[in-house]
């Protein structure tokens, strides 16, 4: 039972108390002061339950990973492979389980994904890629008109995604689609291939310049560690948006193993060499 359900039950109980009859079922006379005491207790229960509901709403509100001061601080010379290790992981181990959790906000943006990565999840995913579920395109994927409506071509939605050529910091040329449906919890770690476990991320955000950067840096590190040790890894991922933008500026990954061998907080930038991204709607232009 989740916190919201529990809070609703408490609220219902409080309301029920205030509606109780004044005469005991056996016919005993009511005791002076009891009615007032019940009212006071009911009010207290009601206020506590209301606070719990508000706490739940605040915890899952659209502003959790969104503010007006988000900056990617991306410097290609410093972080050519699209990631930066910020320090040790910030993990609250008490909220983790082997059942992965995903969330989204009222702008339909993916907000968090977390879970306890274990050996079974990694081995069950080894050697294959899960197909994406229907309608798994994240916020910022579809082209929008001036009114914020998805652009249609006949009966089909028009995607922001296009095939491009990107000159990587290594000097090599990447030829392919600009965006990926970039997993928060990778499918190689048992993550689900659906809308609220992916963001609209550039190819470089997903795998860096040569397959070992971007999100792939920490994903591969965790996967290899779990395969070798069979230990668990606490893993949480949060994309960060500026205001009401639909595409995240960057993603923060926290990963901490049981034994502390892996203990990192990683910032993964959502940029593309030589291109300017409009994070508000997912469109992009060549510089």
Regions found by a protein language model. Give the residues of each.
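Bacterial N-terminal signal peptides that target proteins for export
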Residues: 1-8
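Domain-level detector of nuclease and nuclease-like folds
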Residues: 93-287
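Mixed-charge, low-complexity intrinsically disordered regions
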Residues: 11-13, 23
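N-terminal, intrinsically disordered, polar/charged segments of Gram-positive cell-envelope systems
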Residues: 24-95
